[in-house]
Amino acid sequence: MSPPYPVEILTLFPGMVTGYLGASILGKAQEKGLLATTITDIREYAEGKHRVTDDAPYGGGAGMVMKPEPLVAAIEAAKARHPGARVLLMSPRGPTFTQATARELVRHEAGLILVCGRYEGVDERVMAHLDGELSLGDFVLTGGELAAMTVVDAVARLVPGVLGNVDSSVTESFEEGLLEHPQYTRPPVFRGVEVPAALQSGDHARIARWRRWKSLVLTHERRPDLYARVVLSKADQKLLARREEEL
């Protein structure tokens, strides 16, 4: 059995992270020895009675900046615990995290060290101790904790054995550059809306055709940016020429 995929999160607010990492799929992954998470309070590496981790910015301005001394000390300690792990700061100025990023990170078996920023940002001198920065998109959060949990969740789902169904991570949205097809469960009719006939047919080939067709249609309608990058096969082109009742 392979060793668990290691993740360490450096944060000023461990309580924000603890509950999420211990619940649902992530909690079960740790119980099964597939994922190993460590949550480190950056304040443990701050000196002085009050363990101060922030200070006013040089040049003036609103807010406070995270000090380099405790943060670099925490990063160095995490690196010692996880040799070779990628060290990434959750930051709005980093490249946008995508499913492709998650696949790249899970292949790095030495694991991840995620640094959660706070306040107006992090002293620039910390950057020399990172492997990079990572963003969820063009918006600003109060801190990096939510972003870090998102990254851990997406990466952990790709660790072999974490998802009960081996096909689950392969058929989800974005794995083929397409949105996932809609899902239905019982009852077959709810408030007059019926589950598509193809899904009730028991014909696996027909079900696969419907799912592929719906995935293509949804992506075209809702994410034209993704659809523009899709290379349609001849089979896809034939599917798109058909109506739903013809599938």
UniProtKB/Swiss-Prot annotation:
Lineage top rank: taxon: Bacteria
Instruction: Name the residues that bind S-adenosyl-L-methionine.
Output: 117, 136-141
EC class, as a word, reads: transferase
Q: Which cysteines link up through disulfide bonds?
A: none
* Provenance organism: Myxococcus xanthus (strain DK1622)
Q: Which GO terms describe its molecular function?
A: tRNA (guanine(37)-N1)-methyltransferase activity
In the record, biological process GO terms are:
tRNA N1-guanine methylation
**EC assignment:** 2.1.1.228
Quote the subcellular location field of this record. Answer: Cytoplasm
- A GO CC term attached to the entry: cytosol
Q: Which UniProt keywords apply?
A: Cytoplasm, Methyltransferase, S-adenosyl-L-methionine, Transferase, tRNA processing
Query: Could you tell me which Pfam families the record lists for this protein?
Result: tRNA_m1G_MT (PF01746)
Organism ancestry: Bacteria, Pseudomonadati, Myxococcota, Myxococcia, Myxococcales
SUPFAM superfamilies (alphabetical)? alpha/beta knot
Name-wise, this protein is tRNA (guanine-N(1)-)-methyltransferase
